[in-house]
């Protein structure tokens, strides 16, 4: 996931727009104390007052729709890398202003590996690293309650389709994660034989691949207790679900 500098041409008739910082982010990504203290820090750096407008989203596609169709003029947003690629392609981003006042420019310290991965989403004559700064990265996998599930059972994605887990599984309400889970499971043998890669599967949007993923998701449906983007952490800690296909950051919450 990456933070992105973003600014549209919309204005504000009642307040000077340059004195407002509009942020659109995932829940729990910025400590509330940081948001409260930032205007004072900004004034120390620049001598200018600043007000923050902070909004959160829980699904990448909803965030993109609000910006693209709602013409929301956020300054900073924090989508996943595949959404960055779409935003660049749609000309929704502006280059990052690297004038950080008295604070050093830390962007060159980004890991070369992460920078390389980020720039794989670049567009002709546009390097993604000029528009986005990596915020965090992680993996998706199976979080399980060991009161009900053994580590051995959780060691294979078969567990998501096992009928003994009927109504006990939470899945991420994310198109990319749901599609990826289904299509990877459907091609488990080919992956084991190294005749196809995960990247190839994730980028296969052919009618045949979509139909196969749909079939696998329908087979999984009886086991699903709900589709979540944020509440899975709490449900798992309260023993209301046995298994959560989730992001690594949520898993360590």
Predicted feature residues:
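Cysteine-centered motifs
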Residues: 2-3
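C-terminal motif of bacterial Sec signal peptides marking the signal peptidase cleavage site
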Residues: 6-9
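Early extracytoplasmic/lumenal segment of secretory-pathway proteins
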Residues: 14-90
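Short, well-ordered beta-to-alpha junction loops that form the rim of enzyme active sites
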Residues: 26, 81, 140, 174-175, ...
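Extracytoplasmic ligand-binding site segments that recognize negatively charged/polar headgroups
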Residues: 29-32, 88-235, 240
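Conserved glycosyltransferase catalytic-site signature
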Residues: 60, 81, 229-230, 248
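Paired acidic/hydrophobic, glycine-rich loop segments that form the ligand-binding mouth/hinge
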Residues: 74-79, 225-226, 242-247
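A ligand-binding cleft/hinge motif common to bilobed small-molecule-binding domains
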Residues: 83-86, 243-253
């Amino acid at each position: 996931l990456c933070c992105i500098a973003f600014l549209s041409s919309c204005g504000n008739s009642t307040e000077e727009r340059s004195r407002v910082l509009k942020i659109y982010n995932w829940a729990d990504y910025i400590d509330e104390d940081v948001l409260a203290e930032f205007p004072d820090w900004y004034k120390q750096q620049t001598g200018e007052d600043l007000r923050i407008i902070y909004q959160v989203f829980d699904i990448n596609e909803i965030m993109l729709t609000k910006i693209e169709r709602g013409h929301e003029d956020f300054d900073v947003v924090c989508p996943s890398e595949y959404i960055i690629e779409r935003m660049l392609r749609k000309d929704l981003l502006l280059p990052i202003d690297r004038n950080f006042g008295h604070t050093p420019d830390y962007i060159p310290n980004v890991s070369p590996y992460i920078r390389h991965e980020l720039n794989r989403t670049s567009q002709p004559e546009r390097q993604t690293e000029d528009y986005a700064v990596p915020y965090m990265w992680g993996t998706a996998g199976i979080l399980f309650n060991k009161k009900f599930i053994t580590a051995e059972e959780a060691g294979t994605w078969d567990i998501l389709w096992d009928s003994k887990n009927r109504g006990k599984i939470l899945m991420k309400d994310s198109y990319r994660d749901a599609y990826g889970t289904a299509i990877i499971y459907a091609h488990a043998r080919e992956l084991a034989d190294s005749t196809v890669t995960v990247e190839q599967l994730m980028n296969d949007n052919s009618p045949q691949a979509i139909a196969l993923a749909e079939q696998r998701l329908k087979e999984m449906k009886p086991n699903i207790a709900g589709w979540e983007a944020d509440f899975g952490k709490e449900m798992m800690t309260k023993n209301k679900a046995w298994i959560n296909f989730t992001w690594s950051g949520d898993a360590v919450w």
